[in-house]
Amino acid sequence: MNRTRSASMAQGGLNWDSLPLKLFAGGNAKFWNPADIDFSRDRADWERLTDDERSYATRLCAEFIAGEESVTQDIQPFMAAMRAEGRLGDEMYLTQFAFEEAKHVQVFRMWLDAVGVTDDLHHFLDDVPSYRTIFYEELPDCLNALTIDPSPAAQVRASVTYNHMVEGMLALTGYFGWHKICVERGILPGMQELVRRIGDDERRHMAWGTFTCRRHVAADDANWGVFETRMNELMPLGLRLIEEGFALYDPMPFDLSVDEFMAYASDKGMRRFGTIASARGRPLAEIDLDYTPVQLEDTFADEDARALAAV
């Protein structure tokens, strides 16, 4: 692709109020370094856990680090799709997005090393087949499809898979689990800080995915059907993944409740329908300056904070 012009030099410059560039500025303002997190107390807390508790926590961490590695690799085609569409602001944000995902791989690996977990962890994924279906098949297939077909419909399918299922349902539910484990026991302060930092990054990622779906739905109502169909395909698979993980333990370590986790995941998935639907019939120009996607993620964060404060 030959370059014929530079968007950053166009008359009027860049629109810093557009949602993608707001997210970009927010990420710059909230930069954090994994090496600054203190994991020194986590090793002692880890040693005091039971074998089953360590097994479950290791499984949860294995699912996270493999997931973070997957999304680090799989986001690349979305950048190219934004370039093909001429959306420099989105492309700028996605460079930051990819960097943050790579940083999440780093910090989870640092935590595992700090608590002494250095064995091969692949077997933790073998008995949760839905995990492999989502992360090893559905995610790369949907994102790689953008290299051939960067159309709005393909972007919506990719965003639903990445931003709404992997991040918006599964990762949020995993963070909720980590918080319950750590806060109720008053343990693993390094993990608590790790999850807080990553969660802040992921809220921006999910907001971008919601924004992307909303602008395509506003531009062509047929894309609402694409969104709805893909969500309905993936939500049962995501819920099955949660069930498979809980079925491996009896009793469940940390007294975690499968019903609570299923309800949490379902709620996060279903409430995204309304936010996307609200873009139907809207003037496309309004969507670029509509911060509803950010507000939704902030609402989720506030609800979690209140729930955990009551523990």
Curated annotation (Swiss-Prot):
There is a cross-link at residues 71-162 (3-(O4'-tyrosyl)-valine (Val-Tyr)). GO terms for molecular function: metal ion binding; oxidoreductase activity. It is an enzyme of class 1 (oxidoreductase). One of its GO terms (biological process) is deoxyribonucleotide biosynthetic process. Fe cation binds at residues 101, 167, 202, 205. Mn(2+) binds at residues 68, 101, 104. Disulfide bonds: none annotated. Pfam families: Ribonuc_red_sm (PF00268). The keyword Oxidoreductase applies. Gene3D superfamilies: Ribonucleotide Reductase, subunit A (1.10.620.20). Binds 1 Fe cation per subunit. Its EC number is 1.-.-.-. Homodimer. Belongs to the ribonucleoside diphosphate reductase small chain family. R2-like ligand binding oxidase subfamily. This is R2-like ligand binding oxidase.
